[in-house]
């Protein structure tokens, strides 16, 4: 944190709950980036890591002490949080942890020690000149590292992600993570912020544009092998995905989008097996449950959603974005 006093160290916020390993008695908690978004605005540089931000923390649930931590992107500079779900899966004799943030990089760690085990990029990114394949240490593009107040930089992906709060899901049957992604890019310039108590905020100017090579498809869904980190399949579409993925033992993956579609895909191929169009944008976290021997799928629709919804409104004006319709839909799976 450089020489910043404690009162001026902003950010490090928490988006969602972490995950608990009962055998190891550890909680894995994701932490967002430092604030304001651009290092120059907070009186720092990308070489000031802002310790524990944009990190996975392994915590003792008894006293909250940090047993280990992994700072995925020290000194984060672009409002690209690494603050989302922590998925616990055993792989290759290791007790592994998988997490992915707005950079669209899936990280694989040893959840006992925090040791780096590997990574894979799921969308186009030009933020980092290099990611060390042995350590996972990232090196920012030089113009990003050098950016001062008012200096515009152009980066992919944007603040919508990559990946955002829409959680990925694990399919034990295919040993793959099914990950919802967003494809857009960003120009960003930091504003000057008074380094006094009571100031702060995000403080940056931003513009969004289509991601090169996507043919205007903002939505992407990909299946990544948890052992090899290779892609099994991916599908792209114009509409942004706005739900977490839900997988079932019947080898289905459910996901919804801003264009009101709710679909069931084959976890092995990505093929659409069933779809329906609902009254408004499908967003939230689908759940499944059983009643009297029947299995049900429930999903919410409605408004809000943050940048994953606002950015598609700008970049896909051809898609109607309904402004009403909060509802809960329930479907019964048939044999």
Per-region residue spans from a language model:
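Long, low-complexity segments enriched in small/aliphatic residues
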Residues: 19, 136, 143, 151-154, ...
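Active-site glycine- and acidic-residue-rich loops that bind
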Residues: 4-14, 157-162
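Short coil-to-beta-strand
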Residues: 23-30
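Extracellular structured ligand-interaction cores
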Residues: 13-17, 53-54, 83, 103-104, ...
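Extracytoplasmic/lumenal domain signature
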Residues: 1-8, 42-82, 88-94, 105-155, ...
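Structural signature of eukaryotic scaffold interfaces centered on beta-propeller domains
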Residues: 12-23, 87-92, 162-173, 245-247, ...
């Amino acid at each position: 944190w450089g020489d910043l006093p404690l009162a001026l160290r902003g950010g490090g916020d928490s988006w969602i709950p972490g995950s608990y390993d009962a055998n190891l008695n550890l909680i894995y908690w994701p932490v967002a980036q430092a604030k304001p978004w651009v290092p120059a605005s907070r009186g720092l540089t990308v070489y000031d890591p802002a310790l524990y931000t944009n990190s996975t923390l392994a915590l003792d649930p008894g006293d909250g002490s940090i047993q280990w931590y992994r700072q995925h992107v020290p000194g984060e500079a672009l409002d690209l949080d690494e603050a989302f779900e922590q998925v616990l899966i055993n792989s290759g004799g290791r007790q592994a942890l998988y997490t992915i943030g707005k950079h669209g990089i899936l990280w694989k760690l040893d959840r006992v020690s925090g040791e780096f085990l590997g990574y894979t990029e799921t969308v186009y990114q030009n933020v980092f000149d290099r990611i060390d394949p042995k350590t996972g240490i990232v090196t920012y593009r030089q113009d990003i590292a050098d950016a001062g107040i008012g200096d515009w930089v152009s980066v992919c992906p944007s603040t919508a992600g990559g990946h955002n709060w829409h959680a990925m899901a694990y399919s034990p049957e295919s040993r793959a993570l099914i990950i919802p992604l967003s494809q857009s890019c960003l120009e960003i310039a930091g504003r000057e912020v008074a380094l006094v108590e009571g100031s702060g905020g995000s403080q940056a100017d931003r513009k969004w544009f289509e991601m090169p090579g996507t043919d205007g498809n903002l939505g992407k869904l990909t299946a990544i092998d948890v052992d090899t980190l290779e892609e099994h399949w991916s599908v792209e579409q114009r509409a942004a995905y706005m739900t977490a993925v839900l997988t079932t033992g019947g080898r289905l993956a459910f996901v919804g989008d801003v264009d009101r579609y709710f679909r069931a895909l084959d976890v092995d191929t990505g093929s659409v097996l069933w779809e329906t169009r609902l009254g408004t944008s499908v967003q939230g976290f689908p759940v499944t449950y059983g009643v009297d021997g029947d299995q049900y799928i429930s999903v919410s629709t409605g408004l809000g959603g943050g940048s994953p919804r606002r950015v598609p409104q700008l970049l896909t004006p051809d898609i109607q974005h309904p402004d009403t319709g909060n509802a809960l839909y329930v479907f019964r799976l048939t044999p």
